Amino acid sequence: MSATNKQNAASVFGRPWIFIRGVPSMKFLPPEGPTEIAFAGRSNVGKSSLINALVGHKGLARTSNTPGRTQELNYFVPDGYSGEAGDLPPMALVDMPGYGYAQAPKEQVDAWTKLVFDYLRGRSTLKRVYVLIDARHGIKKNDEDVLALLDKAAVSYQIVLTKTDKIKAAGVPRLVAETLEKIKKRPAAFPEVLSTSSEKGEGIEDLRAAIELAVTR
């Protein structure tokens, strides 16, 4: 990623960001407008914390130690745009409900799953999905199911390892290489794996630049 790319990303993510809408079902989705970048992952993988780190606002996306807390598609955009034609924000970040939380009531899990899958399959303004993988656990069966769905729907996605501060630093490059090997034959996977720590701020600048590049391509 070029210096210009990183400067553009810093400009976008350096603005104040705001929460605009929680979407409990597809009928409540906002009108299609700005490019959407979504974050998917197992419950408690750190989606909300990563979004907060990206925009430099610890309290923007609500975080919780309780798995399954995010139950809607939560939309965030940079402030200062009217949202009208000709004055749309450059992108919207979408915090998706976590999957794989077995302790939630079945009806709730089914509703979350339907919302996530319907959104991934049917949103034309969705440019890329960042699938977050806990560095301590690697890719699980639930993750593979989501990757297969994204492959089938031809939705571009990129793997982001989270919580890398929780493993030995020397093990991060090896984990990145192993993860890349697992996804290299998947048709919709972007051929680069990013590593991040929201707590330490590691990898955040690279992720911002990757998002900016995905939006502007």
Swiss-Prot record:
GO annotation, cellular component aspect: cytosol
UniProt cofactor(s): Mg(2+)
Keywords, sorted A to Z: Cell cycle, Cell division, GTP-binding, Magnesium, Metal-binding, Nucleotide-binding, Septation
Tell me the residue numbers annotated for binding GTP: 41-48, 68-72, 95-98, 162-165, 196-198
Q: Which GO terms describe its molecular function?
A: GTP binding; metal ion binding
Q: Does the keyword Nucleotide-binding apply?
A: yes
What family does this chain come from, according to its entry? Belongs to the TRAFAC class TrmE-Era-EngA-EngB-Septin-like GTPase superfamily. EngB GTPase family.
Q: Which PANTHER family match?
A: ENGB-TYPE G DOMAIN-CONTAINING PROTEIN, MSS1/TRME-RELATED GTP-BINDING PROTEIN
Q: What's the protein name?
A: Probable GTP-binding protein EngB
**Organism of derivation:** Rhizobium meliloti (strain 1021)
